[in-house]
Amino acid sequence: MSDSEEESLDRQLKIVVLGDGTSGKTSLATCFAQETFGKQYKQTIGLDFFLRRITLPGSLNVTLQVWDIGGQTIGGKMLDKYIYGAQGVLLVYDVTNYQSFENLEDWYSVVKKVSEESETQPLVALVGNKIDLEHMRTVKPEKHLRFCQENGFSSHFVSAKTGDSVFLCFQKVAAEILGIKLNKAEIEQSQRVVKADIVNYNQEPMSRTVNPPRSSMCAVQ
């Protein structure tokens, strides 16, 4: 295959990640792009930018430009410009924070406004994050699915902390944008391999109960 033919199989997609500041957008983008989870919360101011190249069926190489938009930009003048030209939009909320789910109406209204003013109609995906905290869930799956059905969103549930379904979410979005259907084997192959950190701690007397600090990692195949 010539260089020009190889280049023709390379695609670039702009994926914009929107949602409230505590929904875990940055952790989601970082987990996908760098396969790590940031344990310390750091609010995104304005815009963060991530890149990752993936391969879809048919040996199609796709570079995803992930635009992590700060939660405070919802009323800002730059938000329209950040969204403009996106092929995909992830609306991210925290499944344990009902307000973060309700606020997606405001985020989506901006997406619709930009779409009407541009020639690009992005694929919109609804992403429920922090499913590792299922016992603290306040947004029922039925609510999530109804919102998807009413607006034609694709549906995803992930955990940026454990890495559960993070890569699969981005892979599915990219494939749907490009009109590529993933088969069951490809989906299963993209599922996260569960791993555990080894936590080292000092020896303590047997009479004392030791609760070492818990650690988490994001591992993506």
From Swiss-Prot:
Residues 219-221 form a propeptide. GO terms for cellular component: ciliary basal body; ciliary rootlet; cytoplasm; plasma membrane. Mg(2+) binds at T26, T44, D68. It is a lipid-anchor. The gene is RAB28. It catalyses: GTP + H2O = GDP + phosphate + H(+). This is Ras-related protein Rab-28. The modification Phosphoserine is found at S8. The small GTPases Rab are key regulators of intracellular membrane trafficking, from the formation of transport vesicles to their fusion with membranes. Rabs cycle between an inactive GDP-bound form and an active GTP-bound form that is able to recruit to membranes different sets of downstream effectors directly responsible for vesicle formation, movement, tethering and fusion. RAB28 is required for shedding and phagocytosis of cone cell outer segments (OS) discs in the retina. Also participates in nuclear factor kappa-B p65/RELA nuclear transport in endothelial cells. Regulated by guanine nucleotide exchange factors (GEFs) which promote the exchange of bound GDP for free GTP. Regulated by GTPase activating proteins (GAPs) which increase the GTP hydrolysis activity. Inhibited by GDP dissociation inhibitors (GDIs). GTP binds at residues 21, 24-27, 38-39, 41, 44, 71, 129-130, 132, 160-161. InterPro entries: P-loop_NTPase, Small_GTP-bd, Small_GTPase.
